[in-house]
Amino acid sequence: MVATNDVISYDINVPYTEVEEDTRPNTKYTRYLPTWDKIRFDPLPPFQYHDPALRVRDKSLPNLLTRNAEVSDIQPMLGSIVKGVQLTDLSDRGKDELAYLISQRKVIVLPDQDLIDAGPAKQSEFMSHFGKPNYQPVSGTVPGHPGFHIIHRNGNKDEIAKFLEQKTTTSLWHQDVSYEIQPPGYVMLGLLQGPEVGGDTVFAAADVAYR
């Protein structure tokens, strides 16, 4: 029988300790290694939110899906892959149309983005088009950019072994900050460095469960 205080219930991909120096030589994007700045967040007051998807009038999405764009669906109800589109080249109308496409397909995968190398400031600027930033108060982030939530496997093999003593799978499901009064409308997930296989992120359409 496992004692209650021994149960690991948090995400095993998110370290809760400082990154050790021997991690850095094997890390391609060292600026994104998690840090814990001593920052206090005041309660976020209610605010008016205007979804950029509602500004779209032409449902053919001409500013997003240009002649170079290729769209393929992953599942009938959820997920599409869009190739031939660079996020850094999108106009404001193109970003609105991206929001509309996300509202229809829930998850959009955009491979080979140069936004990955543009740095956290440019990435934050891009996401500001879609609404106010959300801050994760308990996870590591990028110095000077508290709106980033860093998912990092830091070689915590002992922790993972302990986790698997209590579980029959490494698959973990969660719903992002659904406890908030005004949860995020859009989330951008970028893969900086990962294994050749494994480490998959799975998405589910929770709205379908209510039909």
For the regions a language model picked out, list residue spans one by one.
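Non-heme Fe(II) oxygenase catalytic core, chiefly the N-lobe of the double-stranded beta-helix
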Residues: V2-R211
